[in-house]
């Protein structure tokens, strides 16, 4: 007796059922994500390239240091010279939108995992599946439910990039020193006060590492998301591959690398307190304060 069961047919039935019965919910999700993604993209694209270069260079100087600021200035000027500034802003908008949504969804989920072993046991296999699934697979449901364009590209990117945000939020809260928690409880903190005044502040370094990893994974989805109309630098790389145009593909890839390095260093500085002008000014301010003078004296 042959068992006739097709996983593919089952998947088709589920997808068709969702499309037939949950179209209003899908439209609401698409409208919300489209509002965020298109709003961020319109804002970034509207900034003149010279102003954008100045802003990112000053931010690099403020958070990282003057050497990296010089690199950022030259690298961004090169991207502008290649005529890829607008495409880079579209890619940055996709990354920021996906990261924002991943943070909004990932931090509460990580908190729930840290507070409940049952939730952690349910969510952890899902995160494992999300991280081991090939990135191309996410394009299929995104395109089927939401069509082509920025919205399905953002959704696929969020699904691919969110697991580190959840895991590192959970890890950061669990690694808060028990003495801090005991001190908070001794002073009469409610569970919510303990979370927001003790656990989250002490887990911030781990949470920012999660943000950094989410941004990097979002950038790694740029070319893949362009296959369903996300646009940006990924579209230039994809066009270069399709036409066997090595130069166009190399330019698009180089611009992605520039954006990745700048975002990586800046977000790392946010988690570690920075090493640039911001940190030096903070140290000078601390040294000039009465407490600093008395300690030094």
Per-segment meaning from a language model:
Residues 155, 159, 191-225, 247, ...:
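Transmembrane alpha-helices
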Residues 144, 173, 218-259, 275-280:
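Glycine-rich helix-loop "coupling/hinge" segments at transmembrane-helix boundaries
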Residues 58-63, 76-86, 98-127:
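Transmembrane-helix boundary motif in ABC transporter permease subunits
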Residues 1, 265-297:
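Transmembrane alpha-helical segments of polytopic membrane transport and secretion proteins
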Residues 94-97, 102-105, 111-114, 127-161:
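Generic hydrophobic transmembrane alpha-helix motif, especially the helices
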Residues 1-48:
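Interfacial loop/helix-cap signal at membrane boundaries in integral membrane proteins
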Residues 165-213, 237:
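Short cytoplasmic-facing helical segments at TM-TM junctions of multi-pass membrane proteins
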Residues 87-91, 111, 121-125, 168-175, ...:
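Membrane-spanning helices that line or support transport/gating and their immediate boundary helices
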């Amino acid at each position: 007796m042959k068992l006739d069961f097709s996983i593919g047919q089952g998947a088709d039935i589920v997808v068709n059922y969702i499309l037939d019965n949950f179209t209003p919910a899908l439209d609401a999700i698409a409208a919300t994500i489209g509002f965020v993604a298109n709003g961020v993209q319109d804002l970034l694209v509207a900034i003149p390239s010279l102003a954008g270069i100045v802003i990112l260079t000053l931010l690099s100087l403020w958070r990282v240091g003057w050497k990296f600021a010089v690199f950022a200035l030259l690298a961004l000027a090169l991207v502008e010279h290649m005529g890829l500034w607008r495409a880079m802003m579209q890619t940055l908008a996709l990354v920021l939108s996906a990261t924002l949504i991943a943070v909004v969804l990932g931090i509460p989920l990580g908190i729930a995992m840290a507070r409940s072993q049952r939730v952690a046991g349910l969510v952890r296999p899902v995160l494992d599946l999300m991280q081991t699934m090939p990135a191309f697979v996410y394009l299929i449901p995104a395109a089927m439910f939401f069509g082509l364009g920025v919205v399905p590209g953002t959704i696929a990117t969020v699904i691919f990039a969110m697991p580190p945000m959840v895991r590192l939020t959970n890890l950061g809260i669990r690694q808060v020193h028990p003495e801090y928690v005991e001190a908070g409880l001794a002073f009469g903190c409610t569970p919510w006060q303990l979370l927001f005044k003790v656990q989250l502040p002490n887990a911030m370094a781990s949470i920012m590492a999660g943000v950094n990893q989410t941004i990097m994974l979002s950038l790694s989805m740029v070319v893949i998301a362009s296959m369903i109309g996300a646009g940006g630098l990924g579209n230039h790389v994809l066009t270069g591959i399709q036409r066997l145009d090595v130069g166009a593909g190399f330019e698009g890839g180089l611009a992605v690398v520039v954006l990745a390095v700048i975002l990586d260093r800046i977000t790392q500085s946010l988690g570690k307190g920075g090493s640039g002008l911001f940190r030096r000014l903070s140290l000078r301010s601390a040294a000039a304060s009465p407490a600093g003078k008395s300690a030094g004296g």
